[in-house]
């Protein structure tokens, strides 16, 4: 920008414009006069130090002591002290239950640093040698040494973990047997106790009967691949630090390492056996197997659906073919029976009709003009009848018999005329000649 250039600015807002655009939304409440005093725990602590003429560290130490003493007075459920524990030899400190010494048996590995400090202070206040000296027990400081040793162990994270590794009083033994209803109630505390040794946190819970297959698999996979920080240095045999024999020292260190490895292997085997036992009695595993079996059967059923449909179709086709074959066989049998009956009926009818013809010849004396026909006459009539009978077509024998029956009442001439009619019919038809007959149609 050159010196000759200029910038145009907006005119400033006037007071009138500001007042015109102002919109009040409320009023400020009236002022009230109140008394203000310094309060709070920090002010009270400052006032207390000023009043008693204490330094900061002196005041803090006395307040902690007073607080512990108040807690000691208020707590009515302090652990009872075993008389045998009170007589314990401080030299045998590895044999003592450090949590019991400090009155933390019900907390054990769950006790936090603050609880350990408070418990130690309470025990010190109760069993300090100066306090016992006032009671006449001048040299009775054995249990106080046990208290100091317990606090020394439990206040050191490394040494406390070593003690927790072998603290059998914190273990929960697995149940000998369970039912579907008691499995979770009895096994959950067992796994919660074992979970304290896990490097991986949080540890998956045992769950419930409603847990999914994935959750159950994850739980047992975790325990079968359990990564434990548990060690067994606490059980090491003490190595004398007398400098007399380095070989003995190295030997004892080697022996301690070997024992730690053996204890670790035994503990791993114990834990695996524990998990095996839980898995074998877990009601969910049986349930999952039943569900898997049902799902497998369902998949097989679906997979074989085509084969079943084909088999059903083949069976249906077979049944249809068998039905048709049975119907055809029945129809054939029925037709055969009907045909047989028809043949038998026809045969009977022919036999009956032939009998009518034969009886007609006898009844009308072979159409002889004399009372006793000659043999030649009878023979010629019979031959003519045989010729006529041989030329009869389908149904014509019945017609012949019917015509004879119809004319029998009229007499011999009428019956003879029936034979004549049939003979002439056959001659006209060409099935025979006039020479083929001697008596009829002449």
Swiss-Prot record:
The biased composition feature labelled Basic and acidic residues covers 55-71, 316-330
Q: Report the Pfam families cross-referenced here.
A: DnaJ, RAC_head, ZUO1-like_ZHD
- The answer to whether UniProt assigns keyword Zinc to this entry is no
Where the record annotates domain J, the positions are 97-167
Which stretches of sequence are listed as region Disordered?
49-84, 242-270, 306-331
According to the lineage, what is the superkingdom? Eukaryota
Any single GO molecular-function term of the entry would be: DNA binding
Post-translational modification Phosphothreonine, affected residues: 55
Question: What name goes with this protein?
Answer: Zuotin
**Gene it is expressed from:** zuo1
């Amino acid at each position: 920008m050159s010196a000759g250039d200029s910038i145009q600015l907006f005119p400033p807002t006037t007071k009138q414009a500001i007042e015109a655009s102002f919109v009040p939304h409320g009023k400020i409440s009236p002022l009230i006069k109140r008394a203000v005093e310094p309060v709070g725990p920090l002010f009270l602590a400052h006032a207390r130090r000023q009043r008693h003429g204490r330094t900061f560290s002196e005041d803090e130490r006395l307040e902690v002591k007073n607080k512990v003493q108040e807690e000691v007075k208020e707590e009515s459920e302090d652990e009872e002290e075993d008389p045998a524990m009170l007589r314990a030899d401080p030299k045998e400190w590895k044999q003592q239950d450090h949590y019991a010494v400090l009155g933390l048996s019900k907390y054990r590995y769950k006790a936090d640093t603050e609880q350990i400090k408070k418990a130690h202070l309470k025990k010190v206040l109760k069993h300090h040698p100066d306090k016992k000296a006032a009671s006449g027990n001048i040299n009775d400081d054995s249990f106080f040494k046990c208290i100091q040793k317990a606090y020394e162990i439990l206040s050191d994270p490394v040494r406390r973990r070593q003690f927790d590794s072998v603290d059998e009083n914190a273990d929960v033994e697995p149940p000998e047997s369970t039912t579907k209803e008691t499995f979770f109630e009895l096994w959950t505390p067992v796994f919660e106790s074992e979970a304290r040794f896990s490097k991986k946190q949080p540890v998956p819970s045992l769950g419930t009967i409603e847990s999914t297959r994935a959750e159950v698999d994850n739980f047992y996979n975790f325990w079968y691949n359990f990564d434990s920080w548990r060690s067994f240095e606490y059980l090491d045999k003490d190595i004398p630090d007398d400098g007399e024999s380095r070989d003995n020292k190295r030997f004892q260190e080697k022996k301690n390492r070997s024992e730690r490895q053996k204890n670790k292997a035994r503990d791993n085997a114990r834990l695996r056996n524990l998990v095996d036992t839980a898995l074998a009695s877990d009601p969910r595993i049986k349930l999952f197997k039943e569900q898997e079996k049902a799902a497998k059967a369902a998949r097989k059923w679906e997979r074989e659906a085509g084969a079943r449909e084909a088999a059903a179709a083949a069976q249906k086709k077979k049944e249809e073919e068998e039905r048709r074959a049975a119907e055809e066989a029945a129809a054939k049998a029925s037709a055969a029976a009907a045909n047989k009956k028809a043949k038998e009926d026809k045969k009977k009818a022919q036999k009956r009709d032939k009998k009518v013809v034969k009886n007609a010849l006898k009844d009308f004396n072979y159409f002889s003009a004399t009372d006793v026909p000659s043999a030649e006459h009878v023979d010629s009539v019979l031959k003519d009848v045989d010729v006529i009978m041989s030329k009869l077509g389908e149904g014509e024998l019945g017609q012949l018999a019917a015509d004879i029956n119809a004319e029998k009442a009229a007499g011999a001439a009428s019956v003879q005329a029936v034979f004549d009619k049939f003979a002439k019919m056959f001659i006209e038809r060409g099935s025979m000649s006039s020479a083929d007959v001697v008596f009829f149609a002449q």
